[in-house]
Amino acid sequence: METVVIVAIGVLATIFLASFAALVLVCRQRYCRPRDLLQRYDSKPIVDLIGAMETQSEPSELELDDVVITNPHIEAILENEDWIEDASGLMSHCIAILKICHTLTEKLVAMTMGSGAKMKTSASVSDIIVVAKRISPRVDDVVKSMYPPLDPKLLDARTTALLLSVSHLVLVTRNACHLTGGLDWIDQSLSAAEEHLEVLREAALASEPDKGLPGPEGFLQEQSAI
């Protein structure tokens, strides 16, 4: 009889431990996934393009298939449904800016790789490398600022810094690759990002304490003092 009881207790304990382990696994996948993606993003080396440009003597020898200017997990970060549960309404604008910057950067890299023979000098290539190195940390900063508690002013500052870095990459790429006509899509993309950035900027201003005219309570206090 005692053996049966011991076996039954053992079975129940095993079931309990298995259920607990499954619960921990589910909670980990549900709540820790965004940060896991961010950690992967942090651990990914900077762009293969930069390494290739620093080792190749001729830009035209670079292989476009080997170029990854941004982390391959950024798509998973942008498509993560956890961002949807946002009461502030700011996350959609942050996601839009990240997507625009990601797409712009990828296309600029492709244009750079396809214009190797048109490069002015090796100094132009170096300029692109320097500017490209600044983009990944900016993306990292924006993603980190998207986790609660949200700070509209921090979101505004970091998305602005990211957009400035991408705009700088546009300028140096245009100059280095002699890009002229048929590039309206670049200006349109930057304008679209600016519209989203304006929403974040307004939210940042709204989050600041009003230092202007006194409110009704202050006005009544002033009147009573008089």
From Swiss-Prot:
Gene Ontology CC: one annotated term: plasma membrane
Q: What is its main location?
A: membrane
**TM region positions:** 4-24
Q: Cytoplasmic topology: which positions?
A: 1-3
- Which UniProt keywords are present, listed alphabetically? Cell membrane, Disease variant, Endoplasmic reticulum, Membrane, Secreted, Transmembrane, Transmembrane helix
GO BP annotations of the record are: negative regulation of myelination; negative regulation of oligodendrocyte differentiation; negative regulation of protein localization to nucleus; negative regulation of protein processing; T-helper 1 cell differentiation
What is the annotated localization of this protein? Cell membrane; Secreted; Secreted, Extracellular exosome; Endoplasmic reticulum membrane
Q: Where is this region: Required for interaction with MYRF?
A: 1-88
Q: Where is this region: Disordered?
A: 207-226
Membrane topology, record value? Single-pass type II membrane protein
| Family note | Belongs to the TMEM98 family.
Question: Which disease is the protein involved in?
Answer: Nanophthalmos 4: A rare disorder of eye development characterized by extreme hyperopia (farsightedness) and small functional eyes. The cornea and lens are normal in size and shape. Hyperopia occurs because insufficient growth along the visual axis places these lensing components too close to the retina. Nanophthalmic eyes show considerable thickening of both the choroidal vascular bed and scleral coat, which provide nutritive and structural support for the retina.
The entry's function note states: Functions as a negative regulator of MYRF in oligodendrocyte differentiation and myelination. Interacts with the C-terminal of MYRF inhibiting MYRF self-cleavage and N-fragment nuclear translocation. The secreted form promotes differentiation of T helper 1 cells (Th1).
Oligomeric and partner information: Interacts (via N-terminal region) with MYRF; the interaction inhibits MYRF self-cleavage.
Annotated protein name in UniProt: Transmembrane protein 98
